[in-house]
């Protein structure tokens, strides 16, 4: 068996990777249109990143949405190339390019050192959200790079207006322990999250027990690009509110009991098991119980017909039954 890791009032977000502060880089053969005004297809944008097999490309063509919105400052243009997702999750690909065609990154900079400030992609929804970002560098000497941003929310996001706000591109100086600006500028671009939602929702009601508590699975939303699991715990979470600005040991253990220890496994028809437990989400006390949401975007497009089952806390849902 192969196991892989993928990725209200007083409601507490649980983040796996800080939005826009990622330091991961993928070295891929990904072409970029830069600021040429070319509107690239969703498949052209996403296939090199999330899978280029025929079944994956077919899905991307169906649910992806080319954007092309851009903003320029200080000779550098940020373009939102395309977006795809489902009702509660989305992935946006941005291109950062130097308008004169010269090298974007200094010679001593590598992709894993990059980060950008700003608010990231704001969806202006009345609900909680979490996400991550990383940079894609095909050629360190090129005039452009890509940034991939994922967003997951507890409210529908596939029919809203997004505003991307970014300020300065930085390198992380490990020796100094601080971010140093390498490209200065402020970019603001607005676009519609108009993509097709291909998700299915599995009705809940099943329960499981662990850590001395009973968990009720409220619903599971699953699509070729992401997942979301909503569940309710039969006791109300209590936070220490230490006021230090850092998570206390007590709160860390509480987060584990209510959230991190909830195992989510996706089994594919070929027998592969994907561990989805290490996800972001939210934990919220509510009238004697705790309402939780857990989910994120997959690392690659997964056709629904390739999914055999999904389990939450040991409760198995058969995905092959029509």
Tell what function each PLM region has.
Residues 1-5:
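Conserved small/polar residues in nucleotide/adenosyl-binding loops
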Residues 10-36:
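Internal signal-anchor transmembrane helix that establishes type II topology
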Residues 31-322:
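Alpha-helical, hydrophobic structural elements that either
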């Amino acid at each position: 068996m192969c196991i892989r890791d993928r990725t209200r009032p007083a409601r507490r977000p649980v983040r796996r990777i800080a939005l826009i502060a990622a330091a991961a880089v993928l070295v891929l053969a990904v072409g970029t249109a830069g600021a040429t005004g070319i509107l690239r297809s969703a498949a052209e944008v996403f296939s090199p990143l999330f899978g280029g097999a025929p079944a994956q490309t077919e899905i991307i063509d169906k649910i992806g949405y080319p954007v092309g919105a851009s903003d320029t400052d200080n000779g550098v243009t940020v373009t939102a190339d395309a977006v795809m997702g489902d009702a509660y999750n989305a992935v946006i690909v941005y291109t950062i390019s130097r308008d004169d065609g010269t090298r974007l990154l200094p010679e001593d900079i590598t992709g894993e050192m990059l980060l950008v400030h700003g608010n990231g992609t704001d969806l202006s929804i009345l609900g909680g959200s979490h996400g991550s970002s990383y940079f894609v560098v095909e050629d360190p000497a090129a005039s452009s790079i890509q940034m991939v941003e994922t967003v997951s929310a507890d409210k529908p996001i596939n029919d809203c207006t997004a505003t991307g706000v970014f300020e300065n591109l930085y390198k992380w100086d490990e020796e100094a322990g601080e971010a140093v600006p390498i490209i200065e500028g402020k970019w603001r671009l607005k676009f519609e999250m108009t993509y097709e939602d291909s998700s299915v929702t599995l009705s809940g009601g099943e329960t499981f027990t662990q850590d001395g508590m009973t968990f009720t699975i409220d619903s599971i939303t699953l699509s070729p690009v992401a997942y979301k699991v909503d569940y309710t715990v039969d006791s109300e979470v209590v936070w220490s509110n230490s006021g230090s600005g850092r998570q206390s040991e007590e709160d860390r253990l509480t987060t584990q009991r209510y959230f991190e220890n909830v195992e989510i496994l996706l089994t594919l028809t070929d027998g592969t098991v994907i561990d989805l437990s290490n996800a972001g989400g939210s934990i919220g006390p509510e009238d004697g119980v705790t309402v939780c949401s857990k989910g994120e975007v997959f690392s690659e497009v997964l056709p629904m017909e390739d999914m055999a089952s999904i389990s939450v806390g040991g409760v198995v849902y058969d995905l092959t039954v029509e």
